[in-house]
Amino acid sequence: FEAGLISEEELEHIENVACPTCGSCSGMYTANTMNCLTEALGMALPGNGTIPAVYSERLRLAKRAGMQVMEVLQEGLRPKDVLTKEAFENAVAVDMALGGSSNTALHLPAIAHEAGVSLTLDDFNRIAGDTPQLAKLSPSGKYFIEDLHAAGGVYAVMHRLQEQGHLHESAKSVSLVDQ
């Protein structure tokens, strides 16, 4: 616009369609990747990774999550019970299957370190060499986080990976169901 290559109306149109609504962007950038991996780690309820911010389903999930916190506390499940080596390896496998942000190579080891778990780039390489990419999401593909949600979300990706033997089935989850 400043260079005079497009009109103010064209700029406004681009602004109106660039980000579909409130919430994170629609591509598999760092925010969406980490949100999906929070679910893959077992620290969020199914659906948390992909439900768009404006869907009423997001409000229902928030209510379920609040109720689930109480159940998790009653069961005595603690974050370190969930954040195990197996959980982090599952998250890396989901990351590879989704083609997530490369920033996970920084964020996941940092979270693992805080949980007392060693997660290295060698782990990423080992898991990446064995895990198929199941989704081609923006920016590397033509599909968006809403499309992943419509296709079953992180849960569907994890189910497919589990069928193929790429996940540790014994990993715990705040849903109180083993993944």
Regions found by a protein language model. Name each.
Residues 1-179:
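Catalytic or ion-coupling anion/metal-binding cores of large enzyme and transporter domains
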